[in-house]
């Protein structure tokens, strides 16, 4: 669920306070008692990398569409009335940043900035350095705890009350930050690297799967295909009718997320070449107005209707605002079987009546929770 803060500056103040308290408090009261000079330099280098990457994630613009951008025929045409520019594929208008953002992932309350095409590598490096530093610190703290525990019954003059107090405070705090930030990095890796998706596109996939589960997706994507490729009729009408008459069709057989090429290509598209992943100022390899696509996306007029459907831009049902009406909405279903009438209660999902801009996933997240200005979608 998206986090919303009453005072937006707390989004930066809280992480900065935790980084400073855990990083420098642990060094001064604990690590300086037993680490060598070189080890302390290495530790502080990691702390510095946190601050550098955090600064860049905050102050680097996530990417603005060029004023003269013109979408290709293979994309949905989506014009932003506020920015007065066509949005490139994967771009959205952020209601907080008040701009269209290239390959918008989400608006992050912890950076007071959108995470988009241009600053996604900085955001990922920030998460990486926080995890690496807190994991390294936790390793040192656990080792120190073990040592102090093993010599607890011996008389030694190096025992420090302040060190023991700060170990008791810093260890659980450090572990908490490590676990929470690791879960966020894991989500980013799962979406961007394994599936080539932004968080918004992952939400969109949930919506598409929900439409398919309700048997409402196939007819909509066929409508979109016919609108874009009217020349396929009447030659493909029989194939379309046959497909619609099937009792069940797997979603993977007619929908395709075009930006999922393979994990290695996905991560290089987002982060740049591997040897620059940890370089603080490295950028993505493209300007963010077009992206590599998998082979299923490319249209072939001689292919099957299923393959043609896979060539639709994302999302395949189009950038629609309203969904089709669904009858009376009654939860009572009547079935006649073997001469007997059976009446049963059929659960109704209230989301069935919602369009794209109002639909929410199982976490309660809608497009606006990711920072998207839904009035301009």
UniProtKB/Swiss-Prot annotation:
Keyword Transmembrane helix part of the UniProt annotation: yes
GO cellular component assignments: endoplasmic reticulum membrane
Domain DHHC: 78-128
Domain of life: Eukaryota
Positions in the Cytoplasmic compartment: 1-9, 144-163
Family membership noted in the UniProt record: Belongs to the DHHC palmitoyltransferase family. PFA4 subfamily.
Protein name: Palmitoyltransferase PFA4
Gene that encodes the chain: PFA4
């Amino acid at each position: 669920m998206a986090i919303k803060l009453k005072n937006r500056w707390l989004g930066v103040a809280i992480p900065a306070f935790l980084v400073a308290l855990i990083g420098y408090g642990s060094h001064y009261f604990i690590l300086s008692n037993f680490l060598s000079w070189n080890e302390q330099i290495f530790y502080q280098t990691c702390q510095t990398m946190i601050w550098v990457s955090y600064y860049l994630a905050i102050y680097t613009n996530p990417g603005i569409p060029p004023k003269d951008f013109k979408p290709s025929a293979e994309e949905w045409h989506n014009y932003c009335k506020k920015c007065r520019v066509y949005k490139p594929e994967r771009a959205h208008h952020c209601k907080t940043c008040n701009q269209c953002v290239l390959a918008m992932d989400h608006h992050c309350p912890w950076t007071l900035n959108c995470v988009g095409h241009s600053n996604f590598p900085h955001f990922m490096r920030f998460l990486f350095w926080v995890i690496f530093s807190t994991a390294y610190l936790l390793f040192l703290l656990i080792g120190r705890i073990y040592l102090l525990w093993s010599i607890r019954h011996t008389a030694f003059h190096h025992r420090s009350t302040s060190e023991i107090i700060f170990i008791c405070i810093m260890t659980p705090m450090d572990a908490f930050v490590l676990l929470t930030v690791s879960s966020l990095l894991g989500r980013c890796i799962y979406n961007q690297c394994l599936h080539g998706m932004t968080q918004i596109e992952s939400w969109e996939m949930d919506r598409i799967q929900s439409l398919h589960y309700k048997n409402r997706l196939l007819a909509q994507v066929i409508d979109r295909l016919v609108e874009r490729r009217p020349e396929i009729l009447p030659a493909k009408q029989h194939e379309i009718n046959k497909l619609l008459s099937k009792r069940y069709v797997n979603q993977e057989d007619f929908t395709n997320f075009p930006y999922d090429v393979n994990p290695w290509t996905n991560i290089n598209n987002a982060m740049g070449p591997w040897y620059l992943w940890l370089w603080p100022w490295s950028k993505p390899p493209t300007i963010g107005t077009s992206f590599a696509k998998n082979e299923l996306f490319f249209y072939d007029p001689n292919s099957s209707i299923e393959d043609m459907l896979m060539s639709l831009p994302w999302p395949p049902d189009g950038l629609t605002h309203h969904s089709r009406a669904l009858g009376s909405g009654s939860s009572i279903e009547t079935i006649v079987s073997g001469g007997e009438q059976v009446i049963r209660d059929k659960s109704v999902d209230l989301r069935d009546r919602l369009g794209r801009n109002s639909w929410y996933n199982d976490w309660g997240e809608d497009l606006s929770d990711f920072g998207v200005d839904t009035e301009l979608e």
